[in-house]
Swiss-Prot record:
PROSITE patterns hit by this protein: ATP_GRASP, DALA_DALA_LIGASE_1, DALA_DALA_LIGASE_2
EC number: 6.3.2.8, 6.3.2.4
Pathway(s) where this gene product acts: Cell wall biogenesis; peptidoglycan biosynthesis
Domain ATP-grasp intervals: 566-777
Function comment: Cell wall formation.
Binding residue positions for Mg(2+) 2: E744, N746
Species of origin: Chlamydia muridarum (strain MoPn / Nigg)
Broad class of enzyme this protein falls into: ligase
Name of this protein: Bifunctional enzyme MurC/Ddl
Cofactor(s) named in the record: Mg(2+); Mn(2+)
Gene Ontology BP, a term: peptidoglycan biosynthetic process
């Protein structure tokens, strides 16, 4: 142990503790004090630090070097004791500068992203076989933020207090500049910018800076990174897949494609690009950089998962400035899709809240609901804050539901409010981290899910087969299931399984049925045809105020009306099979006139189809006038509206399945082909009924690349134009030349064991439980959005709790 001793005033701070680790690694004796003792202090104590709780002059060892930071008052008892004793006093930034003298220093500064960029650079160097020293403003996976190594030293340089004037690094990164900590610069942005400019000129080799930032670009010299085409390291593309991002960059005429990093959000792609630029400047090879970024373990309190439950997600993030909050929530939204995002925000410092009040309320657009709690003062004097007015501003400007809940009541409120599938994000640089710890093992109550099947349509039996298959994939960890069977006569039965009695059903108004229906949280309608798939059931569920899965009222009504679908799509330039609508009134008035019009429009064979039934119900292939007449009469027995369609016999039947919100996040399964024994695939062959083999489903569809892309593009266009919701299957006819026509839309596709809908998504990498979850998530989101417009349940609950 070296004889020299260092004493830290405020050793539990993230910046101070990093330097304490380095000094301990180098053999120095270290002591320190702080106003509280947390995990950081506990780690240092286990490493040999002598810790004192509170600030008292007797804590300062004789002849020690006393380290202080910008937040330490000159009236601090230990600071005064060091002055009186003649101890050497050194600012944290000066000590950091001294510690880096014998190594190649890489300093990262800027308003946002310092910790992530410095952590990424450190991990890349470690992957390259180096053992860098590092002093970082966040804990790694091992709970360490500082370490002494050799050759390289990676550190954060705090731009907030002007202390970066102490550094002259070999390499540097300036991530960005924001109106943050301006009070330390007399409110003058130019003084902050001048300090960064001075820092860049003192960089001895290369200063990497954000080339997308016009303020930096106007006054700095160095290498740029960013999405702007003039950047030296130009980010050409990026995409996010779940909790990973992929980006392509060009640097010095070399293209680096699909670089993967275990981070989310455009801001983190920028951070990864900055780290990659530094690594390339150091001569580190591409494979090493890729491997390091792909395996990057992350930093604690940077979208760190805190809970153990599998039915909801609780994340913690250090974001406390409005721009950080906005980036974090948008990244989470991209990762979790339609799941409800509940942001819990603890504003950091009264002064920062006041400085950022102009942009703070609009920072939460990526969330669905926001819980605002008490400001973390960070040592500042308490100020009056109208949390009610601030919550109203957030609701208005971010278009979310927002409520204030006192910090002491947060845990209890969340335990009542968190719902299966929720994603909670605790935001702040204060002590909001205790929330994640307290909810680590919390489990929300299961969702009560009501599965409705059967129905009055002629597809009653297929509905039950679909329900029986789907029921196998309703996870008992997520749902308590109540089954509702609608008889062919429109009566209802209910039970805890699909093995329902043969007794006559009851009306929907029966106390047992109505009572059970009122208690479920969300409805899963597995219904085909009229009264279930055509908007009737959807309208009923909206009227009684129940969330439901699958298509919305409007999408179901349009999708199940084949003529209306054809009219809309034809008007929008999408090819449809030529058709002629026929009304019951017109047919009854003058059959001969109708037949003449039909034969003038089409030649035999042709098809007679019911407007509101499934893809193979009420469909008749006809070859002469007598068959045509009989088929029309039969079709009108099944439906009030009929249409005649030109034959597409000989064409292939190609289908594309969808999940999600056509105006937001949705998923497309790869196309598949349905092949029959020859000719039209009727209802019996489609589902393998009456002892017949079901139609063959082919997933590796043999179509030209051009036709595939065009057909998928049109299918997606249809789903978007109709603002598809929940689920659907869109069917096409494709001829040998690659021409195709829209056939129809199925809002609730068959989900039997023989149906391709579930299998199509399984081939895409989903499992069947995930498909059910997605249906539920979309249904809940759609309901929540409508509820926000007519009520504010979160605010009401918060007020009631007070």
């Amino acid at each position: 142990m070296k004889s020299l001793c260092y004493h830290f005033i405020g050793i539990g701070g993230i910046g101070m503790s990093a330097l304490a680790h380095i000094l301990l690694d180098r053999g120095y004796s270290v002591s320190g004090s702080d106003l509280s003792e947390g995990k950081i202090v506990e780690t240092l104590k286990n490493k040999g630090v002598k810790f004192f709780l509170g600030n008292q002059e007797e804590h300062v060892p004789e002849e020690s070097v006393v380290v202080y930071g910008s937040g330490i008052s000159k009236n601090n008892p230990e600071f005064l004791a060091a002055l009186n004793k003649g101890n050497r006093l050194i600012h944290r930034a000066e000590l950091l500068a001294e510690l880096t003298k014998e190594q190649i220093s890489i300093f990262v500064t800027g308003s946002h992203g310092k910790t992530t960029v410095s952590s990424l650079i450190t991990v890349i160097l470690q992957e390259a076989g180096k053992t860098p020293s590092f002093a970082i403003g966040g804990l790694n996976g091992e709970g360490i933020n500082g370490s002494s190594g050799s050759e390289y030293f990676v550190a954060e340089a705090d731009e907030s207090d002007g202390s970066i004037r102490n550094y002259s690094p070999e390499f540097s990164v300036i991530t960005n500049i924001d109106d943050e900590h301006l009070s330390n610069f007399g409110g003058d942005r130019e003084r902050l910018l001048a300090s960064l400019q001075d820092f860049s000129t003192k960089t001895r080799q290369i200063c990497w800076y954000n080339g997308d930032c016009s303020r930096l670009r106007s006054c700095l010299v160095g290498h740029t990174f960013g999405f702007t085409s003039s950047c030296d390291l130009h980010i050409l593309t990026y995409r996010q897949e779940g909790w990973r991002s992929f980006f392509t960059v060009r640097y010095q005429n070399v293209l680096y494609e699909d670089v993967e990093v275990r981070l989310v959000g455009e801001h983190n792609v920028m951070n990864a690009a900055a780290a990659m630029g530094v690594a390339l400047s150091l001569g580190i090879d591409e494979d090493t950089i890729r491997d390091a970024l792909q395996r990057f373990p992350g930093v604690q309190r940077r979208l760190q998962r805190k809970n153990s439950s599998e039915v909801f997600l609780f994340l913690e993030d250090y974001a406390h400035h409005p721009s950080e909050i906005a980036c974090t929530l948008q990244a989470v939204r991209s990762a979790v899709g339609s799941r409800r995002v509940l942001a819990i925000c603890q504003p950091h410092r009264f002064s920062r809240l006041k400085e950022c009040m102009g942009c703070f309320p609009s920072a939460f657009k990526g969330a669905d609901e926001v819980l605002l709690t008490d400001v973390y003062s960070a040592g500042e004097a308490e100020e009056d804050v109208s949390y009610k007015e601030l919550a109203q501003s957030i609701s208005r400007e971010s278009l979310v539901t927002c409520a204030y809940v006192p910090f002491s009541e947060l845990q209890g409120f969340l335990e009542k409010h968190i719902r299966v599938h929720d994603v909670c994000v605790a935001l702040g640089a204060g002590d909001i981290e205790v929330l994640g710890e307290s909810l680590r093992d919390f489990e929300p109550k299961k969702l009560s899910l009501g599965l409705i099947c059967g129905g009055r349509s002629c597809e009653h039996d297929i509905s039950i087969l679909s329900a029986q298959n789907i029921a196998k994939y309703l996870s008992h960890s997520f749902y308590e299931v109540q089954y509702f069977l609608i008889t062919r006569e429109g009566l209802w039965k209910t039970g805890s399984s699909l093995e329902l009695s043969e007794e006559t059903g009851k009306t929907i108004f029966d106390p047992e049925i109505a009572g059970k229906l009122s208690k479920v949280d969300v409805i899963l309608p597995i219904l085909h045809g009229p009264y279930g798939e055509d908007g009737a059931m959807q309208g009923f569920l909206e009227t009684i105020g129940k969330p439901y899965t699958g298509p919305s009222l409007v999408f179901a009504a349009i999708g199940m009306n084949k003529v209306l679908t054809k009219r809309f799509m034809s008007d929008l330039g999408i090819p449809v099979v030529p058709y002629l609508p026929l009304t019951l009134k017109g047919w009854k008035q003058d059959q001969e006139k109708c037949l003449a019009q039909i034969k003038a429009a089409f030649s035999f064979p042709m098809f007679v189809k019911s407007v509101h039934l499934g893809s193979s119900i009420g469909v008749f292939e006809v070859h002469d006038t007598n068959e045509l007449r009989d088929a029309i009469n039969e079709a009108f027995v099944r439906d009030d509206d009929v249409f005649i369609e030109e034959s597409r016999l000989g064409c292939r039947e190609i289908e594309v399945s969808f999940l999600g919100d056509g105006s937001g996040v949705f998923f497309v399964a790869g196309m598949h082909e349905r092949r029959g024994r020859g000719g039209f695939i009727d209802y019996q062959e489609k589902y393998g009924l009456s002892g017949r083999a079901s139609a063959q489903i082919v997933f590796d569809v043999d179509l030209s690349k051009e036709t595939r892309e065009q057909l998928l593009g049109v299918a997606e266009k249809i789903y978007r134009l109709l603002q598809g919701k929940g689920s659907c299957r869109i069917d096409f006819f494709v001829d040998n030349e690659g021409s195709f026509w829209l056939s129809e839309i199925n809002p609730i596709p068959g989900m039997t064991t023989a149906s391709p809908f579930l299998a199509a998504f399984v081939r895409k990498g989903w499992n069947r439980e995930q498909i059910v979850h997605q249906l539920v998530i979309d249904g809940l989101q759609r309901f929540d959005q409508r509820q926000r417009l007519i009520s504010t349940p979160l605010i009401d609950q918060a007020l009631a709790a007070r």
